[in-house]
Amino acid sequence: FCKEWVEDIQEKGLEPFKQSDINYAKAMARELRDLEDAQEILEGADGYEVSCFWVNEKYGLPCKCKLDILNTGQIGDLKKITASGGGAEWQSFCRTARNLEYYGQAAFYRDGVNAVYAHLKIPLPELQSFRWLVVEDEPPYDTAIYEILDTPRSATYQWFEAGREL
């Protein structure tokens, strides 16, 4: 029965989850929601998994992104981080952010939100922020929120230049 059910689900383009995976995700979400600042970001959001489409002004390239959280022009990005090696601790997260170029992602997403809001004639907040909501992947699922303000556009252009070289 189970194999047939899994095959049926997969044929429909769905992915079955194990109960252990569901429990794991719920435990991480519960720890994140316990942060008072996270509650403000998550509960007051305008949307989750919001898709944005725009054309980059400088290069004329069509762009898209999918925001985890959009809250009155503010962006929230969920990050699951490995607990070993420092996990959600500030210095460890900074190292991970640098190595994985999270700053470029943040700048790219900010450009997208700014372009979409401008197109829709929606005013942006005066102080624009990008927040990473970080949760470790092992119990006790330590959490943190890190914020950058007014992401420099130059980081987006660095991404485009690097992409053009490929």
Language-model-derived ranges and their functions:
Residues 13-17, 88-101:
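Short histidine-centered catalytic/ligand-binding loop motif
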Residues 96-103, 108-166:
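Metal-dependent nuclease catalytic regions and adjoining charged, substrate-binding loops involved
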Residues 1-66:
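Metal-dependent nuclease catalytic cores that hydrolyze phosphodiester bonds in DNA/RNA
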Residues 33, 55, 81-85, 111-119:
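Short regulatory "switch" loops immediately downstream of catalytic or recognition motifs
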Residues 50-58, 71-73, 80-82, 136:
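Short, flexible loop/turn elements at secondary-structure junctions
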Residues 37-42, 71-77, 114-126:
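Secondary-structure boundary elements
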Residues 61, 70, 101:
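Short, contiguous, pocket-lining structural segments
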Residues 65-92:
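Conserved catalytic cores of phosphodiester-cleaving nucleases, focusing on short active-site segments
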